Amino acid sequence: MKLAQRAREVLGEQNECSPADAELVLLGSWTDKGGLDPALAEKLPQLAGKRVFLFGTCGFGGSKEYYDRVLERFASELPADARVVGRFMCQGQMPQGVRRRYEAMEDSPRRQMMLDNFDRALGHPDQQDLDGLTAVLPSL
């Protein structure tokens, strides 16, 4: 939601229309098992032939390579003739239930790494993330 709001601020309020009627679609999603939010599936066919800017958040952060892989998976879910014209991904805060699930895991270095990452994700997207999105939007 923070990223979508920033996009509205940077690009200005546009007349809302269906994706089928838009020239450019900004498609934002949290990352679900490495892919787009499943709730978006029914809207994706409307993006055929459209220019699409992909953006989103994922719980694991800190690696551009990981973000790029996630964005590639996002793009692979679009219709074949949709044209990705830009991308942005940053870390996103996860629900407390995720932390509880990590806490219930057997004590291990992996468990600690996951807990540490969860704690780093708190408050994201943060100002630096929003500034990163702001930097790429004017090119649209």
What is each residue range found by the language model?
Residues 19-25:
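Short acidic/histidine-rich motifs immediately flanking catalytic phosphotransfer sites
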Residues 28:
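Short, charge-patterned binding micro-sites
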Residues 6-14, 24, 32-140:
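FMN-binding flavodoxin-like domain, especially the glycine-rich phosphate-binding loop
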Residues 1-3:
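Short amphipathic alpha-helix
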